[in-house]
């Protein structure tokens, strides 16, 4: 793997050998099939390139255009580290999954349990659900008097986040009185929505979510960068990594653009009935990257109408697994179940720790042979074993290798997935940046709660007309 001169670490690598017919045989994808999509791929590339920084492609410029914002983030993060013992993100979807994934990847795997002097930052929690027991449990382990809350919602109208805002602001007012607003930092849209109004009324420190940056594409803006910086992560290196991947993808030739090749292969695989993509990192540090990817891929590509209004019902279903854990729960399905999956393994070339396996149990050959080896060797051997089992069973798989896990390679990986998703949307001729199915659920939820706005009253009337439920089908 070549070094990336921008982020000063080796480039991440996409290995699609086990997707191709040259390795997999008749169940693999031929170079002729890739060539047949050459024009469509070039068009997808050109459409994304032509709209860089415009509309909902504003995220494509995030690696380059945030110097003043980054300086403000770093200054504010340093102040938070000095003043607070705990940092809590209030958000959901992209406002939570990205910060969780980056924290897990780039900090100690038991970060919160470390003594303060070893952490180098406040304890870190992300409240990405509204389970009442979880909320009560958080109050049991934090002291709001020494906690900073980062409220993240671009629209300012996200019910889950704003309900949490109400709960914690009430608690803060009771605990610290007039100083409560000093414990709130908001990340929201610039000129519309409830949260920006509350921010101005109360004088909260705040960051702006740029126009053209949707939640699932927002990790490289203050949504993701500020929580990362608070916990001591090098956000400049993350952005350099993203820029490195962006530079690698400046070609309409699939053989010169890894994100474009990935989009083409997943498109062909889906056309062949591979309607599921299982993302399987072989590293606990990357466990939540799979969660983040699942939202990105599902919410962007799961659509029922094309850009020109034709019904389509497209979208490959993403799912997650963890190597080696899920070899013992899901691999049986992957190797002998339906031919409907692509397995995307994520490999780490060099872990940040090496753990040796001691010699012992010499009377048991199946145990003794492990002595003198390392867990590093064992986890890679098991990954290779899984790769071979999938190959032997005629199942498509691919491997993304991070030579090491650091801010630069994480920036590369996340930008790679984002760009792949944008290209895939072009190949499918759908809008990869809206989520009307989510909006329907949101409106129905607000109607159930009795929101009196006109559109919710109309939804209440609509929902009242649905078929009555029968006791016959309740057991």
Q: What are the language-model segments listed below?
A:
Residues 78-252, 443, 447:
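Glycine-rich phosphate-binding loops that contact phosphosugars or nucleotide phosphates
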Residues 175-344, 349-352, 437-475:
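Active-site phosphate/pyrophosphate-binding segments
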Residues 2-81, 359-365, 369, 427, ...:
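Extended, charge-enriched "interface" segments that sit outside catalytic cores
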Residues 122, 205-212, 315, 367-372, ...:
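Short beta-alpha connecting loops at secondary-structure transitions
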Residues 313, 319-406:
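Helicase-primase coupling helices
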Residues 51-52, 72-85, 138-147, 264-275, ...:
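Glycine-rich phosphate/diphosphate-binding loops that line cofactor/substrate pockets in enzymes
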Residues 51-61, 117-122, 311-312:
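Gly-rich Lys/Arg/Thr-decorated short loops/hinges at beta-loop-alpha junctions or inter-strand turns
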Residues 386-449:
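C-terminal helical cap and adjacent loop that interface with cofactors, partners, or active-site loops
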């Amino acid at each position: 793997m070549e070094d990336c001169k921008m982020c000063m670490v080796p480039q991440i690598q996409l290995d699609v050998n086990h997707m191709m017919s040259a390795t997999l045989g008749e169940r693999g994808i031929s170079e002729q099939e890739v060539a047949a999509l050459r024009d469509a791929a070039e068009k997808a590339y050109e459409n994304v390139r032509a709209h860089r920084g415009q509309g909902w492609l504003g995220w494509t410029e995030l690696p380059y255009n945030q110097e003043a914002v980054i300086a403000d983030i770093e200054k504010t993060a340093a102040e938070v580290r000095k003043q607070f013992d705990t940092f809590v993100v209030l958000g959901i979807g992209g406002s939570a999954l990205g910060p969780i994934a980056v924290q897990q990847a780039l900090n100690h795997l038991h970060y919160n349990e470390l003594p303060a002097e070893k952490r180098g930052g406040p304890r870190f929690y992300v409240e990405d659900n509204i389970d009442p027991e979880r909320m009560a449990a958080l109050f049991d382990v934090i002291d709001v008097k020494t906690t900073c809350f980062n409220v993240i919602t671009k629209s300012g109208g996200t019910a889950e986040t704003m309900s949490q805002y109400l709960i914690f602001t009430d608690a803060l007012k009771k605990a610290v009185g007039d100083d409560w607003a000093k414990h709130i930092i908001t990340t929201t849209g610039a000129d519309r929505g409830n949260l920006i109004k509350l921010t101005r009324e109360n004088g909260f420190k705040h960051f702006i979510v740029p126009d053209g940056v949707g939640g699932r594409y927002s990790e490289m803006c203050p949504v993701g960068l500020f929580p990362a910086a608070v916990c001591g992560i090098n956000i400049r290196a993350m952005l350099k990594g993203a820029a490195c991947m962006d530079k690698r993808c400046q070609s309409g030739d699939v053989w010169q653009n890894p994100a474009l090749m990935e989009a083409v292969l997943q498109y062909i695989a889906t056309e062949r009935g591979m309607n599921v993509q299982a993302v399987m990192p072989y590293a606990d540090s990357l466990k939540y990257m799979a969660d983040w990817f699942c939202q990105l891929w599902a919410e962007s590509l799961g659509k029922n109408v094309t850009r020109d209004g034709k019904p389509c019902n497209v979208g490959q279903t993403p799912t997650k697994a963890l190597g080696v854990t899920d070899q013992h729960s899901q691999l049986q399905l992957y190797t002998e179940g339906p031919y409907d999956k692509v397995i995307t393994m994520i490999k780490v070339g060099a872990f940040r720790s090496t753990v040796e396996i001691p010699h012992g149990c010499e009377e048991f050959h199946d145990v003794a042979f492990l002595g003198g080896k390392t867990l590093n060797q064992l986890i890679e051997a098991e990954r290779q074993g899984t790769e071979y089992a999938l190959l032997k069973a005629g199942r498509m798989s691919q491997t993304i290798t991070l030579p090491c896990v650091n801010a630069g390679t994480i920036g590369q990986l996340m930008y790679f997935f984002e760009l792949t998703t944008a290209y895939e949307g072009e190949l499918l001729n759908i809008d990869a940046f809206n989520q009307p199915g989510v909006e329907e659920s949101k409106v129905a939820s607000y109607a159930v709660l009795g929101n009196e706005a006109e559109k919710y009253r109309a939804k209440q009337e609509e929902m009242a007309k649905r078929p009555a439920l029968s006791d016959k089908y309740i057991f």
